[in-house]
Every structure is written in structure tokens, then in C-alpha cells.
Amino acid sequence: MKQMAAQKAWTDEERLELAAQLDAELDAFIDGLEKKRYEEGWPEDRWQEEMDKHPFFMKRAPQPGDDVHPMFEGLQKLKYDPEENTRDELALNYKEDGNFYMKHKKFRMAIYSFTEGIKTKTDNPDVLAVLYNNRSAAHFFIKNYRSSLSDAQRALFYKPDYTKARWRSAQCAYELERFDLCTQMCEELLEVDVDNEVAIALLHKNKMKKLEIERNQRKEAAEAKRRLTRFHRLRDAIEQRAIKFDDQKVGKKDVLSEELLYPKFLPLEDHPVHLDEDGSTLIWPAAFSYPEFLYSDFYQQLPETTTMRDCLATLLTEKLPYDKAHNYRLGNVHVYYENRKVGCVHKVDEEKQLAEIIAEKGFFVSGGALLFYVVHKDSRVEQEFINERRRPMVYS
């Protein structure tokens, strides 16, 4: 065999020169290849957006209305297609979705997923019990206690020894103030685990709340009875005095109601007519209007034994805000009341008590209060007020 020629000894400069030559030849080869645009990938300006849509890289589940990646649609079909899954598998897939939403506190989406699982009509009672219990939990977290209780009870129907569902039932029953059911659920939990601390605590809390509500109900019932008794006494006193109300229809005597006695004037609305402590004197809310100034004064509690002069003495102690001439003073004013039924006014005798004025044939309580008009005596304002055209009230 022929001996091979001895290898050439390369210097460093020769090696560098050869490497540069090979790089240049490779670049020339690449530049000589046919140019073709890359069109099969994601556009550079939407690369991140497309990445987020891809089922392998997405960071969150698609929301309603989002564009869904075709691969994601395919995976969904594999997961939810009835032809690809049994009823149990479909129910478990929806349960898995619901648990995912529960973990991320998307409780309404969780309710939707668990509901879809129930709709699969799986025959597995354990799966149905879990779906109902989990949907009960989702309802509970958004305070849909009635729906939560209903689902927890359904879970117990499919799985009578389901501790979680029984505890959820107890919690919902407490929130809904169904105290007997809460007691029953807690006692059943304690039959299984006598040392169940949360059940013991809820049982005690439930008992205390029941006692408190029953006590409050007794107080409210007693107060309602007292209020009704006071109203009946007030009604009898008003009827005995034959007091008339302009809200009552002509020719008809309506049964007196609290609404009829309720003052319609804002400053008086919390001070309806009532009897004094000994039950002998009516205390009235009253309004005194000054037509000249479009201004009113209010008495929140005015005994019927008060004379009109006493009322004026109090009202006119200080100068009225708009009375620059100081015409409105005791002895220099007249007081009227209006009979809206027939559309006329009546002058008030200042020496009479309110009870006497109210008893006059033409006087009607207006809007739950006594209403009087004060005008400057013998003035143009008084004449205009008296002669003002008034239309009688019309009732059907």
C-alpha cells in the first residue's frame, strides 16, 4: 500500500484566510437562493396577541364574545362533544370547569358550568351530588342563600351522608332565618361527629338569633297593639267632635285612616294629630300662611284649647321677615280659613278656641293639618284674598 503524502503544515495566517474564504462562499450561496416571503406564521405586529389565543400558551380562559383559536375549538369539541364522551365524562368535564372558575372567584361562570354538568343527565348519583353541592357553594358566595339551600338539599337527596352539603344547608338555613332546619342540620352533623366544633358553634348562634328575633317580634306585636289602641282612641275622639276632612268625598263618610290623618306639609309630616297624655285634648299640626309674602309659619303641636289670639300672639312676637312696614302685628291682622269644598273663605273669631273653629260647619282639615291664612286688616291684600276666584273641589 502506497504511503500517503505527508500533511501540509498550516500557519495561523493561512487558517484565518481559509476560514474567511469559506464564510464568503457560504454567504454567496445563500444570497443566490430563491427569495420567498414567509407567510405561514403570525404577523409580527400581532405576535403576542396570537400567542395569547393559542391553547398551548394562553394565560386565561376565553371569555364570552372572544375570538376562539381553531385548535381551542377542536379541543372543546373533544371535551364537550356527546359523541366523544359519555354522560359521566361530560358531567365531570363541566365539574372541572366549574372548579376552575371557583378557584378564580368567577362564581357566576362556575354556576353556569355546574348547571351544564347537571343538564348532561348523568345517572351517577355521586357525580350529581357533587355538582349540586358545588353549585350550592357558588350560590352561597354571592349570597344567593335560597338557591344555595335548594342545591344543597338536592345534593343530600342524591347522597344522604354528604357532610359538606349538610353543612352548607345549615349555613343557608341560618342566613334565611329558617331556624328549625338549621337546628336539624346541625344535630345531624353532630350525630356523625359529636366534636364538630363549627356545628356546635352554629347551633348555639342559631338558638341565640332565634330567641332574639322572637323577642323582637313580641315587642313589635305589643307596640303594634298599643299603636292600634291609640289610633282607635284618636279616631273616636275625632268622630265625637264631628271633625271633617277635605280629602273625604262629598256625601260619603270615609272611615278614618292613618293616611288621612298624615300631614302633607313637609315641616309637619312627623307630627300628626294625636291625643295628649290624659286623652282629653287633641294636639294638632297647623300651618299659618301669609298670602302677601308667599310665606308660612308652622305649629307642630298645637292644643285644641288654644285660642286664635294666643296663636297670633306667638306668631307675631317678632317682625315677619318680609314685613318691612311692620303691618303684621297683634290687633292689625285678620285670620281666615278656606272651605275648598265650595270655594269660599271664612273669617276667624280670634277669641274662639281652635276646637270651636274646627267645629264650624265650613271648616275642613286640609292635608292632615289645620290651615289658616293671615292678612293685613282692611288692606288691599285682604280684599284681593277675599275676592279671589276659587273653584269648588270636584269628586267623582
UniProtKB/Swiss-Prot annotation:
One of its GO terms (molecular function) is Hsp70 protein binding. PROSITE patterns: TPR_REGION (PS50293). Keywords: Cytoplasm, Nucleus, Repeat, TPR repeat. The keyword Nucleus applies. More abundant in young embryos, pupae and females and a lower level expression seen in late embryos, larvae and males. SUPFAM superfamilies: TPR-like (SSF48452). GO terms for biological process: protein folding. This is DNA polymerase interacting tetratricopeptide repeat-containing, protein of 47 kDa. TPR repeats lie at residues 91-124, 129-162, 163-196. Gene3D superfamilies: Tetratricopeptide repeat domain. It comes from Drosophila melanogaster. The keyword Cytoplasm applies. Pfam families: Wheel (PF18972). InterPro entries: Csn1/TTC4_wheel, TPR-like_helical_dom_sf, TPR_rpt. It comes from the Eukaryota. It is found in: Nucleus; Nucleus, Nucleoplasm; Cytoplasm. Forms a complex with Hsp83 and Hsp70aa. Interacts with DNApol-alpha180; the interaction inhibits the activity of the DNA polymerase and occurs only in proliferating cells but not in quiescent cells. Belongs to the TTC4 family. GO terms for cellular component: cytoplasm; nucleoplasm; nucleus. Disulfide bonds: none annotated. May act as a co-chaperone for HSP83.
